[in-house]
């Protein structure tokens, strides 16, 4: 498996909104994949294919059903409109957030737009003030990276041992540092103080690379 030319998201944004009258933060990432909507939708929703590039998923994978990602979040699929839109709750421990995915046909392929919305509650804010958007963003960058390899290799499985080896390598750590820095730039563009954003970035990069 060739990791050299692989990359994560192409566009990153940080925003604030409200949900049901409560303040939220939104981390958005997008990328154009050189494939059609149908193939990209299949990579995102087919149980076997999801495990090939992301993680094993179980449950009732249809609108209204519950899903569980092995060793990660679970939740409810609140919208499933093939091949355009997927909405779900993202439940991890006692926390709940919301993920939306949209697929848009472009001249050069299909654009995947992912938004992860989190409440500005006491627990989330403590985490945000320490790590900023990169805590969530770097994780999604790694997912975009894995999906890209899967798409470029005709649906081939991303070998777990090779992936872990790459993540522990200098190249893998550089990828995570670069991702954290890219999220810092998006954070600053949203209005965050540069020094505060850079401090968050340093902590995020240290966490992901195991050097903290």
State the predicted function of each range:
Residues 1-3, 7, 26, 32, ...:
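Long, contiguous C-terminal modules that act as interaction/assembly or targeting platforms
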């Amino acid at each position: 498996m060739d990791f050299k030319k692989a990359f994560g998201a192409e566009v990153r944004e940080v925003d604030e909104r409200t949900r049901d009258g409560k303040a939220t933060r939104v981390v958005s990432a997008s990328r154009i994949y050189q494939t059609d909507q149908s193939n990209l939708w299949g990579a995102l929703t087919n149980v076997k294919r999801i495990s090939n590039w992301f993680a094993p998923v179980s449950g009732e994978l249809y609108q209204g059903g519950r899903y569980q990602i092995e060793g990660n979040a679970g939740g409810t699929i609140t919208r499933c409109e093939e091949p355009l839109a997927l909405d779900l709750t993202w439940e991890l421990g006692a926390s709940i957030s919301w993920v939306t995915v949209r697929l848009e046909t472009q001249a050069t392929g299909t654009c995947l737009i992912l938004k992860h919305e989190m409440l500005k509650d006491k627990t989330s804010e403590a985490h945000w003030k320490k790590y900023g958007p990169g805590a969530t963003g770097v994780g999604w960058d790694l997912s975009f990276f894995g999906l890209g390899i899967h798409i470029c290799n005709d649906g081939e499985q991303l070998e777990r041992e090779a992936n872990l080896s790459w993540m522990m390598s200098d190249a893998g750590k550089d990828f995570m540092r670069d991702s954290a820095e890219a999220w810092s730039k998006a954070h600053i563009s949203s209005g965050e103080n540069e020094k505060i954003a850079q401090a968050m970035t340093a902590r995020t990069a240290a966490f992901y690379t195991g050097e903290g």
